[in-house]
């Protein structure tokens, strides 16, 4: 039994190593996806820019980039998020 388990492990590892890497069928989009949102607003003065996550992500999100280059996910439906976006667009 131990021999067959070891043989199975070797076969699985060899298969994983030999499998061709699949490229993205659409593009080399490196935009991150968000799986959780920040619970409360960030200080507006800490935010320098923003971007939206890709439409390929399961959760729509706005990613705020702070002055220290931290990326923070926010819910685009929240009022404070929309206000921050408007403020960034005006500046």
Swiss-Prot record:
- Keyword set for this entry? Chemotaxis, Cytokine, Disulfide bond, Glycoprotein, Inflammatory response, Oxidation, Secreted, Signal
Give residues where Methionine sulfoxide occurs: 90
According to the record, the signal peptide region is: 1-23
State the tissue distribution: Expressed in the follicular fluid (at protein level). T-cell and macrophage specific.
A Pfam family this chain is assigned to = IL8
Post-translational changes noted in the entry = N-terminal processed form RANTES(3-68) is produced by proteolytic cleavage, probably by DPP4, after secretion from peripheral blood leukocytes and cultured sarcoma cells. N-terminal processed form RANTES(4-68) is produced by proteolytic cleavage by cathepsin CTSG.
- Gene encoding it? CCL5
Q: Which domain of life is it from?
A: Eukaryota
Q: Write the protein's name.
A: C-C motif chemokine 5
SUPFAM superfamilies per the UniProt record, alphabetical: Interleukin 8-like chemokines
- Subcellular compartments: Secreted
Assembly notes:
Homo and heterooligomers with other chemokines. Interacts with the brown dog tick evasin-4.
| Classification via InterPro entries | Chemokine_b/g/d (IPR039809), Chemokine_CC_CS (IPR000827), Chemokine_IL8-like_dom (IPR001811), Interleukin_8-like_sf (IPR036048)
Gene Ontology MF terms: CCR chemokine receptor binding; CCR1 chemokine receptor binding; CCR4 chemokine receptor binding; CCR5 chemokine receptor binding; chemoattractant activity; chemokine activity; chemokine receptor antagonist activity; chemokine receptor binding
Glycosylation sites (chain numbering): 27-28
Q: Which organism is it from?
A: Homo sapiens (Human)
Q: Where is this site: Cleavage?
A: 25-26
Outcome of altering residue 31 to A? No effect on inhibition of activity by tick evasin-4
Q: What is the effect of changing residue 49 to A?
A: No effect on inhibition of activity by tick evasin-4
């Amino acid at each position: 039994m131990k021999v067959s388990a070891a043989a199975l492990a070797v076969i699985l590892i060899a298969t994983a190593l030999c499998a061709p890497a699949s490229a993205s069928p659409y593009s080399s989009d490196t935009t991150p996806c968000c799986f959780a949102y920040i619970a409360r607003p960030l200080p507006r003065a800490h935010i320098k820019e923003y971007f939206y996550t890709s439409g390929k992500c399961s959760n729509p999100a706005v990613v705020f980039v702070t002055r220290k280059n931290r990326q923070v996910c926010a819910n685009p439906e929240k009022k404070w998020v929309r206000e921050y976006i408007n403020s960034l667009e005006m500046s």
